[in-house]
Structures are given as C-alpha cells and as structure tokens.
Amino acid sequence: MNNIAYKWQTRWEEDKIYESNPNPSKPKFFTTVAFPYPNSPWHIGHGRTYVTGDILARYKRMRGYNVLFPMAFHYTGTPIMAMADAIAKGDKELIETFKDIYEISPDVIPRMSDPLFMANYFKEDIKASMREIGLGIDWRREFTTIDPEFSSFVTWQFHKLQSKGYIVKDTHPVGWCPVHHIPVGMHDTKGDVEPEIGEFVLIYFNSEKGIFPAATLRPETIFGATALWINPSEMYVVASMLGKKMILSEKAAAKLSFQIDDIEIEEKIKGSKLVGLKVENPITGKHIAVLGADFVDVSLGTGVVMSVPAHAPFDYYYSKKTFKNNNIEIIPVITVEGLGNALAKDVVEKNNPKSDEDLKKLTEYVYRTEYNKGVLRSDLGNLIREEYRNELKSLGGLPVPKGRELITNFLISKGLGRKIFEVMNKPVYCRCGTEIVVKILKDQWFLDYSNKEWKELARKSLSKINVIPEESRKDFEFTIEWLEKRACARTRGLGTPLPWDKKWIIESLSDSTIYMAYYTISHKIKQYKLSPSKLTQEFWDYVMLGIGNLEEISEKTGIPSNIIKEFREEFLYWYPLDIRHSGKDLIPNHLTFFIFNHAAIFQENLWPKAIAVNGLVLYEGKKMSKSLRNIIPLRKGLKMYGVDVMRIAVSSTADMGSDVNFSESLVKTVGETLRKMYELFKSLDNYTGDILGFPEKWLLSRIYEITSSTTRHMEALELRDAVNELLFVFSSDLDEYFGMVSAEGREANNKVLREVLTIWLKLITPFAPHLAEEIWHEILKQKTYIVNEGWPEVEGSKMDELTLLEHEYMKRIVEDIRSILNIFKGTPKLIKIYALNDSRYMELLRDAIVANGQMKKFMDIHKPKSREDARILQKIFNESLEIDDKMKKLVTNYNINEVDVLNKLSKYIRRKLNVDILIEPYDEEVKKTYNKEAMPLRPAIIIE
C-alpha cells in the first residue's frame, strides 16, 4: 500500500493539484493548522491535528470550494535553542532518543548543537512526514519565522499593536528561567506546560526570633489559625527581607529573591529547632505554637503555613495525629448552610482518609464549597483584637470571596502582610531542565491582554466563531477572562527583534498569532523576488488593511502598483480564515492570542470564522513518553501500518475533543476493512447479475442515506461518526446485500454494485485518498483525479425511503425473534409469525404517534367503549412511546400492510434465522390457541 501512496503523492505534486490561486468563479475555503517547531522528528501523535485539517480540506475541495491549505515552520524562540544546547552539553537521554527511537545517524547528532542546522534538518524531516502522510499542501507558500520577509510582517504587526496601546512596558510577574534569565511560556518548557501564576498572601506572625510569614491562599481563615506548620526535616533561614527579620525555608528565600530585592540571609537553622516557638496572630492577638509536619512543602510559598483545623482537612488530620489525646482546638470561621461551620473536621471524620491523595481530594471539596457557598460567621468580631475590631466590623456575614478581598487589603494596608506569586502547577521545567520560578519583571515589554477594550473585542470575535467541539467554547471564554499582561519578548532565541527596542526578540507565542494572513501573499513575495527592505509599514498597511495611496506606496517602495494591488486582491480573496486547527492544549495561549490579535488588527469581516481543537493520541491507552518506550516515529509508523490506515487511525477513531487511543488492534481492524473493500473492487467483474430487486433498491438507498449522514458529519467535523458509517456500517451493509441476493439464489447486480461502490469511493477519499486514487485509476479506469471529483449529491438520488423503512422493520422482527430464541429450549423447527392484517390498528398507532405522548388527547379522539377497548388503546399508546423514529416514519408516512411486507421479505428472514418460517394474518383464533396477541409492528411469534 505504501508504494501506492508514494505513486499518487508524486503524481499530485507533479500536476500541482494543491497549488491554489484565486478563482472568483468558485467559493474559497482557507484552512490552516499550527505550524510546527522543527526541533525533533514527528511521532504518530503529531499526525492527528494535521490529518484532521487535511481531511476537511479534501472534503471541501470535493464540495466545489477553491481550497487553500498552506504550511510554514516556527523557528522562533527557545524550543530549538534549548534542544541545541542540550545536544551541545551531551544530554544522554536526548541523544539516545534521537539515535534509538528516531534512528538519526550518530554522525549528524553532534552537528545539531548548531540551532539553525537542527531547525533546517528537522524542517526537512517534518516536511517529508507531511508529504508521506498525504497532506495536500500548497508548498509554494512555505516560509520560516526567521525569514527577513516574514520578520517585516511581524514588525508591522507589533507597530500596529503598540499604536493601539496593546503593548506596554511594565512590571509584572512572569514565569522565569533562572539559568537563561528570560521569561518562559508554554513553548519554552519541557512537555509544553504553561506556568500558571497565582497569588499567595503572606501573613506576618511575630515571634521573639523574628516574623514567620505564613503563605496562604485563604487569608480569610486567619481567625481560625491554631498553630503554624513548618517542616522539621528541612533547612530554614533567618533573613533580612523588606526591612524585617523573617523566618522562612531556605528554598523559599532563594525563590523569592526573584520577586523581592535585597534578601540577605543572616542565619541558617534546621526546621526542628523552630518547633515549639510561640507566635502571635496579627489579627486576633492570640499566641499559638509552631508545630512540625513533614507534609509541608518548603518549595511552595514560604515553607510556613497556618494550621486551621476547622477549614483545612490536612490541618485537622495531622493535628489529630500530633495531639494524641484528640484535644484539638477548633475555631470555626466559615459557615455553609446545611453543612455546618467546621466542614474540614466533618469531612475527615466522615470519610476517614487513608492517604495524602485522599486528603487532597477532600481539600479541593472543602475549599470549593466554602468559597462558593460559605459566609464568614456573623460574630467574627469576637475573635478580632480590639484595635482592629471597628475597621473589620463589616466582615461578619460576608460571602467568602468578599471577605477574602477585604482581609487581604487590610493586612497589606497595615503592614501585616503582602502578596507573593507562585507557579501553581509546579514543578514546571525550562527546556534546559531548570525549574521555573516567578520573577517580578521590571521594564519588560508586555502584550496587555488585561486591556478591557481589547478583551471586549476578543469576546465579540469569539461569539462569532464556530468552535468545534462546541463544549470547548467555555475554555476560550475562561481564558479570555483570566488573561493578563504577557511578556512578548526575550533576550535570547531566534526571531524578529522588537522594532523599537532591538535588544529584545519577539517570542514564539507572540509572532504566531496572525501569520495566517502572511500565507495569502508569501508565494508572491518569492515570485516577484521582493527584498525585505521594500516590505515597509506602508506596504503592509495597504495589503492587509487597504490603508494608503497605492501610487505613493509604489513610488516609495519601488514595487509596481499593479503588483501591490495584486497582493491586496489575493489577500482579500482568501481572508478571513475559514478554520484554524490545533490541539486543545493550545486554548489557554496560542488559540486565544490568535483571537485577540485578529480582533485588534483586522476589521470585523476579516476575523476568523471557526476554530477546531482536538485531543491527544494515546498509544495502547497511555500517553507517549520516552520513559515508557512507546513512542512510534510517524515515518516509521507509516511504513509499519500503511499511509491511509494511519490517517484514519490517528484522526478519526475518537470524537474531536477526546483522545484517540492508537492500538495494534485498531490499525489491524482499519487495515482489514480497507483491504476488504479493495478486494471487492478488484472482483467487481465477477458479479454478472442484472436483476433490480429489493436488495438493489435497498443498497442504493443505503449508500445515499450514508452520503447524507456522512456529509452532515463532515460539516460538523464528526470524523469518528463519518468513518464508522463509511467503513464499519457500510461493510455490514454490503454483507447484508450479498446475503439478500444469496437468499434469492442469484448473482449480485454488477451495475448497481459498481454505482454504489463508486459513490462510496468518493466518500472515503478525504480519509484514504491514496487507496481511492489507485482504485479510481487502476480498477475503474478513470482518467481524472478522484481527489478533484465532486462530492456525491443526495438531491434527486435513487434513495427509496419506503424500502429502507421496510428493511428496518424486518430487522426489528428478526431481533425480536432472536431474543425469544435465546431463551427457547430445544431446536426450533418452525417459526410462525402472525401479523395484524387490519388497517384500523395501524391507524390507531398513527394517531398515538401524532398525539406525541399526550394520552388524554389520544383517548379523547378514540373514546374506549369497554375495558377491552381501553386495554388495547393503552397498549397501542405505549407502543407509540417505545418505537424509534424510523418506525414512526414508516407508520405516519406510509400505508403498509405488515403481512405483505413480511411475505415480500420472507426469504431474507428465513436465511437470517436459518429456520423455516410461516407468515399468516393474526386473528382471534391465534390468541385462543397460543395465548399470544399481536399489536401494530409487533406480530405474535410462535416457535415450534
């Protein structure tokens, strides 16, 4: 099969069928998939997003659209630099991965210490992967993000953002690599993890040795603090910090030095030496003890935490272990209606946790419940020291969120605390291997995603975007709301210099937000050999926004006006972007930035129309990782399993938002089904029948029904449902057809079979284009490319709804009989089917269906005259509630006689059951003899 794939990939490329140019006579469809970082080869997991985009592009092309599907490569930022650095340092694990898993020559690997060599090497490798998996890309438009022509476009973009006030110089917390001294985002970290920055509140507890700054996410619980926890096994320091002598963990002091200037270590001390000290609660004035607990994470916050047993499951659980006599002080602070005022204590007692993992789950429940439903107790004033009581009198009865805000502001205003920042999803590691910290960055350039005006534009844009799957919309909405300032430049890495401050390089998630617009004209820059110096701000203003005087711009740039106009027209032909494909992990950054930046720069009619996000690819149920040794390089996978099998397996065997589970059994099933279809096409000439009977009408109707449902699935990107119908349901339909003609003792109809299979071949083309092209040319002897053929139309087709519904009715009867046979003792010799032959019963069922579940309405029409009438009407009404939509359609749209239908289909029923059958009209004699009653669509079935 791979020879077939290579043959057609070569032919398509030679004939340039994916090179797309404006064609005003056709509707356009512009689709893009995130361009890749060329810092390693692709494995099978990379294929999903790209094949999904390709399948949709191929489908739209067959629907008559002029489709543009381009590709480029993302050289910007630190991903490539970090990988090259690792090679230069002799990173054993990485070198072994390249050598053993990806089979890169040992002679080549050392040369990858040069970032550009690495990027260019893997660019060609990834490009080969894209070609080999059959992506129909217009390669004329290819570029890299360090091409000077593209840099001129990014420079223009940043001038636009700055002119609108969306780029600011500010002080702000950022994820930070302590080794490289640069801000770090998702694409700079191992595993592409976005550092999530959150706030802790420090509360200052005085002691004779200094201040213990307890770090908390819940400052409102300070009133219930009964102790402080520290880790007795770890090192702590006495440090001069913020003009105060503070006691915190050694690791915390090192980490906080990136947020607080001039921290000086005066003394190092073992945590165990601090246990037993007394500290003063700054709000209540109460003196409490410092206790030791190994569960305290000294790298989180300050390594000092409050113990609030009433509201923290960990604190209650470990207080019980510490105070063996169970003499635990409980000071309730928060009341939850119906759940009392000491929720942590109650849930620990009730659930009896066995591990820290159990305690974490209880903690999440308590924190969430108290935050959403809790209020501060009304008599809170009794716990507050007198000097603050008046200022804090409004706290009692407040909902927890408001109480938290009030007490935080109070602590800071009185000098009793401050805020610090933490990586909430720690540990997150830079690609160099260093753990990320939070740094308060001064004089840094930020994209100000907190700008209210800009947020509103993003919300408006999102409201017009078709998000696939729709349930991902809430993730976009959430991201838009929480996004704040984001560092947009680094002092290290590849990329475009910040135009007004060239010591900074624009980072990778900031130069990749509107590059889709650049695709529309990138090939023309090459075609006309335009130098980057000619691609001025005025040039881009005109091409992208229609701003400026064409003749003046032509004179200034030296580019003929007709060429500039050609650029503008091509851009307007393709834009807006019709759909953007990416992994769902990029919603919290790239995809939302994509929305923001388009909304900021382009007019509303050029905003993106749709975004499709997909899940990951697992291997045998597990995430692919080096440690599990379960990574399959994509190019190797294509050789092992076949191109079209891989395309289907990685893209179309799970819902869009779910993870695909790639497995040996999956690819085997897909491969066997494709091969079965291939063999059937090869054997077409063996079928010589010409009878057009019920089986042929049914098969023709089925292929058009499948065409209709596949079209619906493709429009919604429900690829799993489409593949299920095309491969597995249709394969079963073919078995059914051959079974029916066999029951009639005749050959299959060659003409019908050829027509049906040709329609199927077109439907499967977006998924398996290589196999489809081979069959189209070599077996069906066609001269055109099937990938350029039109999509099958259902309108005016040979679909016979009654035939489909009669077959569905037969299927239902067979299922009923089989369920009886399952409990039948002995060997059945004859099955008697007694069906109603009285049209009045079918009319009653029709009326019951029309009543749509309203029994009174149904009974009012038919008014039972006896108990027996009422019983029968009740049974028919119940039947109307139980039957599916297809059977309802059969009853309401057609006047069928069940006996006639069953007699017509009796040969097929007999073959399915492999038992003699007798079909007779139902009458009262049957009821007397067998004590069985027939109802509409429910014949009486007797097995002898």
Swiss-Prot record:
Reaction equations catalysed: tRNA(Leu) + L-leucine + ATP = L-leucyl-tRNA(Leu) + AMP + diphosphate
Binding site for ATP: 626
Record's keyword annotation contains Repeat: no
An annotated GO cellular component: cytoplasm
Protein's recorded name: Leucine--tRNA ligase 2
UniProt keywords, alphabetically: Aminoacyl-tRNA synthetase, ATP-binding, Cytoplasm, Ligase, Nucleotide-binding, Protein biosynthesis
Cited HAMAP family: Leu_tRNA_synth_A
Pfam families: Anticodon_1, tRNA-synt_1
InterPro entries: aa-tRNA-synth_Ia (IPR002300), Leu-tRNA-lgase_arc (IPR020791), Leu-tRNA-synth_Ia_arc/euk (IPR004493), M/V/L/I-tRNA-synth_anticd-bd (IPR013155), Rossmann-like_a/b/a_fold (IPR014729), tRNAsynth_Ia_anticodon-bd (IPR009080), Val/Leu/Ile-tRNA-synth_edit (IPR009008)
Motif ('HIGH' region): 36-46
Subcellular location(s) per record: Cytoplasm
GO molecular function per UniProt: aminoacyl-tRNA deacylase activity; ATP binding; leucine-tRNA ligase activity
Enzyme class: ligase
EC identifiers of the protein: 6.1.1.4
Motif mapping: 'KMSKS' region: 623-627
Record family assignment: Belongs to the class-I aminoacyl-tRNA synthetase family.
Swiss-Prot/TrEMBL GO biological process terms: leucyl-tRNA aminoacylation
